[in-house]
Amino acid sequence: MKENFIAALGMTVSASAKQHQVVDNPPVDIILIGGGVMSATLGTYLKALEPGWTIHMYERLEKTAEESSNGWNNAGTGHAAFCELNYTTLSPAGSVDISKAVAVNESFEISRQFWAYLVKQKILTNPQSFINNVPHMSFVWGEDNIRFLRQRFDALQTSTLFRGMEYSENPQQIREWAPLVMDGRDTFQKVAATRMAMGTDVNFGEMTQQLLAALQQYPQFHLHLQHDVVDIKRNADQTWSVRVADHSNGGRQSTVCARHVFIGGGGASLTLLQKSGIPEVNGYAGFPVGGQFLVATNPEVVGHHHAKVYGKASVGAPPMSVPHIDTRILDGKQALLFGPFATFSSKFLKRGSWLDLFHSLTRQNLLPMLRVGLDNFGLMRYLIGQLLMSDKDRLNALREYYPQATMADWSLIEAGQRVQVIKKDAGKGGILQFGTEVVSSADGSLSVLLGASPGASTAAPIMLELLASMFKEQVTTDAWQRKLKEMVPSYGQTINGNLALTNEIRLSTSEVLGLTYIEAKPLPGEPADGKWEGLQKAM
């Protein structure tokens, strides 16, 4: 019996050894975790900057770009702050702060330049497959909201980035811009709208697939599908050991060593960062919020609307909850989406685990999470109200933006999961942070992107920021500086306030991407600024 026990133990140890294979090869240059637009963008940058580097990408699903990057899992708005009212806030003194809107727009201009470069390099093909002009509108009703929108419009005109925006309180003009929004509306209701004709709809799923298809042409790039990262550890030589489970091979585990690691796993990024054990993660937590959209594909409905119309968020609602009715171009076809309607799930990914939230709780982040819950009753009340909504309630919400809507034309779909960042705060104990944030190890060799909106629209500038933190020595070299300026001609420049630079960039990228160009003109009495030389040559 003793011999049988020893034999059985030996078989168990042997089986365990077979299940986990330690790869004793030289470290790869970088591991990208997650097959979405962020990892694809970083991989594309690095392949241009260091063609000889070895890059391994690990994606847990059968296909890439199936979570937040998928076109049906996000709003597809090219976030440029043209229509999103939450990027401009009203101060107690009554003035409108446009600093966030300017920053978001500058970031989107960087993305446009990067995409235009990739089209010229034939890395991205057929721009209309991933980006199309759809005018961006803000639409409000009620005296207070109209006053705010007028103030916002006036404030934005001080920025060269928002020249060409139109404002109207004339119902007939607004009907020409967005007939579905006005048809059937109470004629006595006072309304106002702004419109930016150069707004865009972006299919980030299609873009990601094209970027990865180009990367796979290089022998140094290796894409591993159905590979789940289960652990990340720091080695004595300051490299990283990344343990992965191959679910296409019975969960067989192996360990790969890397000099650098980027975690771009969407909602799952927080728990992956926690596995690394770096002290910088202490105090970070995540609050998952899901979303649903009403979708219409009836040509008679879809054909009468060509705009992304954003309203004003409810009091206490998170920025990502701003109601909007959008023209979307997905899989080559037009559709209308209205929402989002918030949902709650403890999953950090749409195809994640119900235990994600609970697995992310630690002694360091439990207090910040509890403080956020206590300090955000408005958000909690909003979420509860959303969860209790009936089909009739959703139809009534839709009719605020499309008065003649009938439920027969619409169906409800589940969008992607977003995980809002919660971080420790010395004063409040914990704060809920909207937007995205890069968190890195002290030496920058491991970095992660946390958060949500504006997200994919600003992938190019976010990855530029990450390049500077991960590759501190390389980014200052002449070779990298030249290449970065080739890929993003305004790199190192401030676009806002430079009328000539604004127009040069927009004209060049519009021509390459097949988009509408609107000249930014000086205000009355404002001198035209100097022309930035060399942009067209660089583009």
UniProtKB/Swiss-Prot annotation:
Keyword Flavoprotein part of the UniProt annotation: yes
Listed pathway(s): Carbohydrate metabolism; tricarboxylic acid cycle; oxaloacetate from (S)-malate (quinone route): step 1/1
Keyword Oxidoreductase among UniProt keywords: yes
GO biological process, one term: tricarboxylic acid cycle
Catalytic activity, reaction form: (S)-malate + a quinone = a quinol + oxaloacetate
Main enzyme class: oxidoreductase
Cross-referenced InterPro entries: FAD/NAD-bd_sf, MQO
MF annotations from Gene Ontology: 2-hydroxyglutarate dehydrogenase activity; L-malate dehydrogenase (quinone) activity
Disulfide bonds: none
Sorted UniProt keywords: FAD, Flavoprotein, Oxidoreductase, Tricarboxylic acid cycle
Required cofactor names: FAD
EC number in record: 1.1.5.4
HAMAP family per record: MQO
Cited PANTHER family: L-2-HYDROXYGLUTARATE DEHYDROGENASE, MITOCHONDRIAL (PTHR43104:SF2)
Similarity annotation: Belongs to the MQO family.
Protein name: Probable malate:quinone oxidoreductase
Phylogenetic lineage: Bacteria, Pseudomonadati, Pseudomonadota, Gammaproteobacteria, Enterobacterales
